[in-house]
Amino acid sequence: MSEYRLTCVNNSSLHGSFALYQVPPSAPGPMGPACLAWLARPAAPGTQVRFSWSTEVGFIWGERGTFGGRTTFTAYQYVAADPERENLIDFGSDSFGAPTFQNLRTGGAQGALTIRQLNATFDFPIHLGIALGKSPIYTVDFNVNVLGAFIPHRNRCWVVFGSYTAGEAIDAEAQTNVQVVDFNPS
């Protein structure tokens, strides 16, 4: 697995945080995945921050909630995957009714991570999606008997400066002054 580093410099007179996020390759709009601030770090004027992460990808589920007017995601389970091999997993409940991933295997679309959402009911809202470097990048609402495919950008990220925390939902379509950073995978 590759590991990347990115240094961001705050050359402004503003206090805030740099946030890294991903934009899903398709399905924008209300039914598309929620983009999350996958990494975030505060930077005072005249300072710099460094991010580093692994390009390991995997499946993730948890809860999304609102606190202080911000929507954030808290992860409860992570399962490492490979978009070219073990890229299909089932999501449902165990014999006690607890939400869980199970049955990681080959068989999903090449280059994508696919979640088969089984027939299950939960007493609280479940969100599931994918992670990069074990941090969530996109999530969707759990929907019974739906197949969800996600394509991670392992070698690209979007950077924005403002008031962000890791796990916070970002409206990618509303962002301005965004920097897209591409990494050479070799």
Task: Pin down the residues of each PLM region.
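Intrinsically disordered, low-complexity segments enriched in small/polar residues
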Residues: 1-186
